[in-house]
Every structure is written in structure tokens, then in C-alpha cells.
């Protein structure tokens, strides 16, 4: 069965796993999902991730992070979707919660946070907001 929006599926699996306090969540792997997981790890929203290959299929296993029994990720939501892509120039990349959260942006220079995209001077597709 094909999936219409694999990034939304990744975000939903993370959100659902954190609501039931799971330690890890496993999703089908892709280059963009690995890049998103790397940004989440660099920003401190997850403990880590590992790519596990079984034959011709690879799974991305994400270790979720909790603080005082509560999930570190309070809000994670998809912005750009297949039916309505959201592109922003370098000057109009949005801030999430006045800079307390991050927007994950895919640019010609790779997947990065909104702050890094502004510092690099590139715009791109706003994938999701994380706070």
C-alpha cells in the first residue's frame, strides 16, 4: 500500500508514541526522514535514531526523549503537505513560538532549522513545526 504523505506519517507516529510514553518508535526509512530525525536530535527533541536494514527494507528507529515524565516535544505538526505546498523565501521563514520552537525547512542546501536557513540565507519548503 502506498502512502500519500510519509512525512506526516512520521510525525503522527512520533506524536502517538509519545502520548503513550513509548521509549522508541519505528518508521519506514527514507533520506528525508533521516534528515528530519537528525535535525530533531541536533535540537535536543529526541535522544537519537538508528537505521536498521532487513533485506531490501530499512526501518528508522527513533529514541524518544522525556523530561520529568512528560514528552520533550509538546507540539509537532505538518505545515507543507502534498495538497498544499508551503514555500518561504529567506526573509519570510516563520518563527515558531517566538523562537522557542523550530520550523524544519528543506532547502537546496539540505534539511535544516529555520534559524540555520535564515543564517545561511536560503529559503525552501517548510516541512513542519516542532515545539
Curated annotation (Swiss-Prot):
The keyword Oxidoreductase does not apply. Keywords: Ribonucleoprotein, Ribosomal protein, RNA-binding, rRNA-binding. Gene3D superfamilies: 3.30.1370.30, 3.30.1490.10. One of its GO terms (molecular function) is structural constituent of ribosome. InterPro entries: Ribosomal_uS8, Ribosomal_uS8_CS, Ribosomal_uS8_sf. One of its GO terms (biological process) is translation. GO terms for cellular component: ribonucleoprotein complex; ribosome. Disulfide bonds: none annotated. PROSITE patterns: RIBOSOMAL_S8 (PS00053). One of the primary rRNA binding proteins, it binds directly to 16S rRNA central domain where it helps coordinate assembly of the platform of the 30S subunit. Belongs to the universal ribosomal protein uS8 family. Part of the 30S ribosomal subunit. Contacts proteins S5 and S12. NCBIfam families: PRK00136.1 (NF001109). This is Small ribosomal subunit protein uS8. It comes from Paracidovorax citrulli (strain AAC00-1).
